[in-house]
Amino acid sequence: MTPADAFLARGAMLRGIRSAPSRFGTHPPALWLGSREIAHLHRDEVDVRLTRVGIRALRAELLSDARIERRRPSSDWVRIRLRGEADVERALELTRTAIRRNRGRGAV
C-alpha cells in the first residue's frame, strides 16, 4: 500500500468523513465533511483544506515543516508530500484539524 493509499483509507475512517469523487476532478476519491471537500490527492501529495484562518493560526508550525507548502496566499489549502508513514500521520493530523476548522462552514 502506498502512503497515498494509506492516507485515503485511514482518512475515510475519521469521524464524519466520507469518501467521494473530488470536485476538482482528481482521480482518487477525496475526503468530504458534509458538503465540503477537505482533502484530495495529487499522486504522492495531499491537499488539505485548513481554511485561511486555520493557516494563519498554524503559520509558524506549518512554515517549520518542510513537507508542507501553502497553495497560494489567498488559499484555504496546504499541500503535504507523502513519502512514508510519518508523512501519512502528519497529513492525518492536519486533516483532523481541517475537520475542526471546517465544521459549520457548509460542512453539515
What are these regions (language model features)?
Residues 1-108:
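Charge-dense, helix-prone N-terminal extensions
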